[in-house]
Amino acid sequence: MADVRFVAIGDSFTEGVGDELPDGRVRGWADIAAQGWADAAGHPIEYANFAIRGKLAWPIIEEQLEPALALEPTHLSFNGGGNDMLRPRTNMEHIADAFSRVLRRCDEQGVRMILLSGANPAGQLPMGSTIQRRGDELSAAVLRRVSGRDDVVRALNWPDHELSTGAYWSEDRLHMNSHGHHRVA
């Protein structure tokens, strides 16, 4: 059995949309991180990516969390909320509660949680100020929920100003390109 069993859940950010391979598959930050982890360890790790593009935060939890935990991972990454922020009406506190649910289930199963915030596309989008405000609210709400939890790995991409520049984004300006996924990994 591998020392590391890493499972990723999320939406297009974790799936890898925007970083298409020549054969049409996508390769995102989670795939790159898993390979880097194996390379650093000097042996393979077990890895599964359950992420599905377009998913809202709570459906990610409802559809992906339990199947992911059934694999008995040592580490589980979660990102969500980016699609929720694009909706006309959304409650950031309710979305942040999804992160609390994942953390609780990880605690119950003895799984180390890797928490990611999405990269910030606000500067490139119409209604960017709304996206900026919602992303700031979601980030703050999630960080309050994991405050004092040194066991939670945090990869905070939202405040990374370099990552929000155009060089890291695909043509649609909603998804990161290969450079963006590599920076996050």
Language-model features: locations:
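Alpha-helical cap/lid subdomain in secreted, periplasmic
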Residues: 36-39, 43-46, 59-183
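Flexible, glycine-rich phosphate/dinucleotide-binding loops
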Residues: 15, 56, 122
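Short linear motifs at secondary-structure transitions and domain/linker junctions
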Residues: 26-27, 51-54, 88, 128-131
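Serine-esterase "nucleophile elbow" of acetyl-processing enzymes
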Residues: 1-53, 65-72
